[in-house]
């Protein structure tokens, strides 16, 4: 586990080596804004297709399901063929799907293309992130991931505002055109800047793939650390999926007011990532998680207070979500690193396993809470957010403490 990280060859973080992560984050931005730009427009899209607004969250959940569907293949495939080939092919496929969705005329066809576009999430998480972790030393990799998160977070900051513009002034179709062009620009940067070396993996029959996944999923430490990721990320994912319905459909905010309401929420995430970059070298790795999760729990309690005292609902929603996002910002990159390095299996396979658990959990929980929301409205959202963060304080917290203790013991030797 921890000792394995000392055997991985890495490159120093400098202006030259930073160009690859910057090219990758351009694609990450395209993939994320593929959700954050489109999700606010989903009320208009469902109206165009003549279906209920309750279909709106399904655009995001099918996007995430697409991300989970091929992670099992992309990670191991990149172990064999090299990260660069698989990543470049994935970028082109994503751009093609963005163009094809322009031809859809029914919500079912639209969701099918959203599912296929979601494969871009796996390209990022199972291939791109694995390449970052392998190319940089541990703390540098976490800094790069946090820096990438800050740049990609322009997507949820700009997405709602641009989505409001699409709804009010032009067709939603143009959003997909812009996303496709952005992905193609990223492809050019990755082709030029991404290191082309591949990890040395013994060529084995593809049946070994299932043995590798069995090793990964039978690792209790891996499961404990990885299951923390959807728990920590779920409140924000639910907010992104449901906030158009909460703020616009239920609370009657305008599309512009909806866009502006997202700024403090995602600013909290950006500030959290900046704080992580600043303090990570001063603290034991994992300490920021132990700080961040109580902050997130406090945020969920404020959400509940807002539903109890309706006069303060909108301020409580925004303050609570801002605290949740700040806590996630100082926690998530560290948790991801711990999960990825908790197994001896090749990193492409481990990254794929992480991606599958993460995306499948997101899909299932968003669809479940979407249904609960039709029955219980805001209570479904706020109590779900509280439950997910509270669950982290069970087995995932113990797994984190064990990992931190193991690292201390390794450093002493």
UniProtKB/Swiss-Prot annotation:
Gene label: craA
SUPFAM superfamilies: MFS general substrate transporter
Protein's organism: Acinetobacter baumannii (strain ATCC 19606 / DSM 30007 / JCM 6841 / CCUG 19606 / CIP 70.34 / NBRC 109757 / NCIMB 12457 / NCTC 12156 / 81)
MF annotations from Gene Ontology: transmembrane transporter activity
Spans through the membrane: 18-38, 55-75, 84-104, 110-130, 147-167, 170-190, 228-248, 260-280, 289-309, 312-332, 349-369, 373-393
Family annotation (PROSITE patterns): MFS (PS50850)
Protein name, UniProt field: Chloramphenicol resistance protein CraA
Lineage of origin: Bacteria, Pseudomonadati, Pseudomonadota, Gammaproteobacteria, Moraxellales
Gene3D superfamilies: Multidrug resistance protein D
PANTHER family the UniProt entry points to: BLL2771 PROTEIN (PTHR43271:SF2)
